[in-house]
Amino acid sequence: MEITFLGTSSGVPTRARNVSGVALRLPQRAEAWLFDCGEGTQHQLLRSDLRSSQISRIFITHMHGDHIFGLMGLIASMGLAGTGHPLEIYGPPGLEEYLRACEKYSYMRIGDRLRVHLVKPGLVFEDKEFQVTCLPLKHRVTAFGYRVTEKDRPGRFNLAKAQKLGIPPGPIYGDLKKGKVVTLDDGRKINGSDLCGQPEIGRKMVYCTDTVFCETAVELAQDADVLIHEATFAHKDAEMAFDRLHSTSTMAAQVALLAQVKQLIMTHFSPRYMPGNELTLDDLLAEAQAIFPKTIMAKDFLSYAIPRRKALAKSLH
């Protein structure tokens, strides 16, 4: 699992930063999932080593333009390129109406290539490998934060030990690999977990924007390996943040601290903190790190590989 930031500016693009877009690469599936799709996202994809044909799912947090104005261009390009698979899009109320209006007035035929899912708090998507959930955030319009959870994987099966115990090969090995207890023909009961190493702990990524500090963000981010959280304003501009229902750098850090996440990556920065101004992004980073040291700043095209957690080794001998 690897995160690539395609846009990290709030509201409008700058020369160095595009508006919101984050890709989650899933190499084991040859897929990428996109979180928000601001204007120019497909251009950012062209400048990265991602391909639009890899995108299978798009998760939209809310209906503000800097998070959705790139959708129709990307969808049109993917349709012309013939990706060969339907595109699943998840988002808040109004998303499908917006897309269908764009389709109608631009005379673009989406057809069955696009499947739009209205999200509600709770489960959004689940398969054998991943689960995606969402909770409402606190913004001026309906907004959701997303949590991607990779499911734990069984530990490595010790074939040599199984053979030493005289367990005959066959379908029974499949049950043992799943940690099940099986009964052999000679009456012996074998616990599959005794033949497997420690499970690989699934990784967790949380994406929270746009929002002012709220308890649901803390709940959503609990024990995440990576929390991507907006930090539109500096602490000095907290009054403006509360008025516009955006977060300061210190709010993002407080969410990370309370949720006990492993890594905080801040994004969605106001252009007012560009180099040369009274306050810069270096100041926002220092503010956050004073509360939560494991904080870094996102920039366009930054890639971050989510590390696996280390489990206690279990002897297989």
UniProtKB/Swiss-Prot annotation:
Its cofactor is Zn(2+). Disulfide bonds: none annotated. GO terms for molecular function: 3'-tRNA processing endoribonuclease activity; zinc ion binding. CDD domains: RNaseZ_ZiPD-like_MBL-fold. Its EC number is 3.1.26.11. InterPro entries: Metallo-B-lactamas, RibonucZ/Hydroxyglut_hydro, RNase_Z/BN. Zn(2+) 2 binds at residues 66-67, 210, 268. Binds 2 Zn(2+) ions. The active site is at residue 66. The keyword Protein biosynthesis does not apply. Zinc phosphodiesterase, which displays some tRNA 3'-processing endonuclease activity. Probably involved in tRNA maturation, by removing a 3'-trailer from precursor tRNA. HAMAP family: RNase_Z_BN. This is Ribonuclease Z. It comes from Picosynechococcus sp. (strain ATCC 27264 / PCC 7002 / PR-6) (Agmenellum quadruplicatum).
